[in-house]
Amino acid sequence: MNRYLLILVPILVLPACASLNSAITEGDSQVLVRQMQTRVYESLDKGDTLRSVLATLQDLGFVIDTADYEMATITATRLQEYELRVTVTVKDRNSHQLAVRANARVDDQLIDDPATYQDFFTVLDKAIFLTRHNVN
């Protein structure tokens, strides 16, 4: 009987260790995804930032689904070969910085390709520059 317990206990404990490591790895990857989805901008009004996000999404061929200025969230869709849906949220980071986070999905699958977010933020950087300098 004791022999069976010695065999059974490690068999029951090992899967628990594996799932814990998996959860830690998934948490780490979520942090990395969040980092590539977020860019911080200095000394710009939240309304101006939201207008720049709207312009950027439209320049990239997206149709705006919802724009909630109170919640500082914009959702847009681009239909080509597939449905690409983006939600962008703007929130205060501190008194002189705003964090812009873009979350892109294709058919309910999160896009975790850094190039996708880099392309979006490159265009947004230009739009914010133009807004900051009052260029239409």
Regions found by a protein language model. Give the residues of each.
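Positively charged n-region of N-terminal signal peptides that target proteins for export
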Residues: 1-4
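C-terminal motif of bacterial Sec signal peptides marking the signal peptidase cleavage site
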Residues: 13-16
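Ser/Thr-rich, low-complexity intrinsically disordered terminal regions
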Residues: 18-136
